Design a protein with these regions (language model features):
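A short, Trp-centered hydrophobic/proline-enriched beta-strand micro-motif
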Residues: 116-124, 168
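Glycine-rich beta->alpha junctions and the first turn(s) of the following alpha-helix
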Residues: 2-5, 193-290, 354, 385
Length: 385
């Protein structure tokens, strides 16, 4: 039985009962919906052995091939599988620990990710370190057998539902930019951490501010060495690109299918201009799929290929345009808000952020020109005094 057939059978048997209400839920723009139920689903998923399929067998995985993992992600999305509460742990933290962590760290952290009982969030962005991420100001100092952390993180997805956070902090006084950084693993349930949800115009609150006031992490909870924080942080982001993006594209396909269904029901499908835009959206989605498949032939150590640099700006712009298409298909009713936003209204509002988070389109263009094409770096302004 193929992995697709295996998962298909399991989803038919288990995405039922109380879990039926979170089918198609919990994806981008809807990540704060039914947190307790999605956490229960994550644990059920883990108990069935579906988490960490690509991991080596010695760490509880199945050494699943890349193409099998592609099929797995596509099949999960095809069933309307709920947005995974543990996706940050499985797709970002676990590969980083496997690639750069010690054996003790693997033994400590991988089981909680594998069984779905420990959820992770990402502590990168700060009020003055967003697109310019190397401007990190959060401080960490080693005191005895603990790191002591002071500072603030912002736009931290699902921090209020998580158990752990991985944090980039500055550990060497007097350093700037990418130098002197550490990559720490910090438990969230402690007196020195204050988590404040950010309520958005879309009505959701999946993002948070996280304040550290002499928060502590065990001395051994550092990935790599002092000064290697930037290298580890960038490698982690590289793990985002690959097979899991094909599952994301299946979710995009579901959104496009809903747009087409709506257009057929309200008669907007007869508009030649909208039909052309729907066709262009379909073509763009196919381009994304083929590019993602091509990226699978690249390295799996977190490094980024030229295609990887291009991928983010392409899908972010495509998804933003899809949100605008959704509003035009709804027509005048798009401006009417009932008790709860419709799925297509949520798509429009959330997709506006796609071109900002994880690197703005402007930053991505600089990266493509400088790193992928080898063009001269953009002149940077200087500060006098």
């Amino acid at each position: 039985m193929s992995i697709r057939e295996e998962l298909n059978q399991w989803m038919l048997e288990n995405l039922t009962g109380e879990f039926e209400q979170i089918r198609w839920r919990g994806g981008p723009g809807d990540e704060d919906s039914s947190p307790e139920l999605r956490r229960a689903w994550e644990q059920k998923f883990g108990e069935a052995g579906w988490i960490g399929l690509q991991w080596p067998e010695e760490y509880g995985g199945r050494d699943l091939s890349l193409m099998d993992f592609v099929e797995f992600n596509e099949e999960y999305a095809r069933h309307g599988g709920p947005g995974r509460a543990g996706h940050i742990g499985e797709t970002l933290m676990a590969p980083t620990i496997l690639a750069y962590g010690t054996e003790a760290q693997k033994e400590c952290f991988l089981p909680g990710i594998k069984n779905g009982t420990e959820l992770w969030c990402q502590g990168y962005s700060e009020p003055n370190a967003g697109s310019d991420l190397s401007n990190i100001n959060t401080k960490a100092r080693l005191e005895g057998d603990h790191w002591v952390i002071d500072g603030q993180k912002i736009w931290t997805s699902l921090a209020h539902e998580s158990d752990w956070i991985f944090v980039i902090a500055r550990a060497e006084e007097g350093t700037k930019g990418r130098d002197g950084l550490v990559f720490l693993l910090v438990e969230l349930d402690q007196p020195g951490i204050d988590i404040r949800p950010i309520h958005q115009i879309s009505g959701t609150a999946e993002f948070n501010e996280v304040y550290f006031t002499e928060a502590k992490a065990e001395a051994g909870n550092i990935i790599g060495e002092v000064g290697e924080g930037w290298k580890i942080a960038m490698a982690l982001l590289g793990f985002e690109r690959g097979a899991s993006t094909l599952g994301q594209q299946m979710m995009f396909q579901n959104e496009l299918n809903l747009i087409i269904k709506t257009a057929n029901e309200n008669g907007r499908a007869d508009d030649p201009s909208l039909r052309r835009r729907i066709a262009e959206a379909h073509a763009g989605l196919k381009v994304m799929r083929y590019n993602a498949l091509r990226m699978l032939n690249g390295t799996q150590d977190g490094s980024t290929s030229k295609e990887g640099y291009i991928s983010k700006i392409f899908w972010a712009t495509w998804h933003r345009d899809l949100g605008e298409l959704a509003m035009d298909v709804i027509g005048a009713d798009a401006e009417i808000i009932e008790d709860e936003l419709s799925p297509l209204q949520k798509l429009f509002l959330f997709s506006r952020a796609d071109t900002i988070y994880a690197g703005t389109n402007q930053i991505q263009r600089n990266i493509i020109s400088e790193r992928a094409l080898g063009m001269p770096k953009e002149p940077r302004g200087t500060t006098n005094g």
